[in-house]
């Protein structure tokens, strides 16, 4: 029984979806997907909760495993800023969030 399970695991780990131009937002990955049976190639998706990242190349979510391609360049730059100047980076995050906040409809 273990041999069958190990073979299934090996097959599953080589057949996972790929995310490009991704970023991590509130515990979810957002990026352009390919090879996902539930989404068309080139679609932008929001994953379920990220449970683990393995060697910066694979992410396990509640529903699927993703191979990580290149991150979003703006998001990568923000991470570099956070390492070099956390206060400045927090101001940028606050500005980014205020720009991307959902519109509120006033009646």
Residue ranges with predicted function:
Residues 65-68:
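Short, isolated positions in well-ordered beta-strands
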Residues 59:
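Short aromatic-centered micro-motifs
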Residues 1-50, 71-107:
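N-terminal non-globular leader segments, chiefly Sec-dependent signal peptides
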């Amino acid at each position: 029984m273990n041999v069958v399970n190990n073979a299934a695991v090996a097959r599953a780990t080589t057949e996972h979806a790929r995310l490009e131009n991704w970023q991590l937002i509130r515990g979810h990955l957002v990026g352009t997907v390919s090879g996902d049976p539930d989404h068309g190639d080139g679609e932008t998706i929001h994953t379920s909760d990220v449970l683990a990242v393995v060697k910066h190349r694979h992410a396990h979510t509640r529903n699927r495993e993703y191979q990580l391609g290149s991150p979003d360049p703006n998001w990568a730059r923000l991470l570099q800023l956070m390492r070099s100047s956390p206060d400045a980076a927090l101001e940028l995050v606050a500005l980014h969030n205020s720009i991307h906040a959902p519109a509120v409809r006033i009646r």
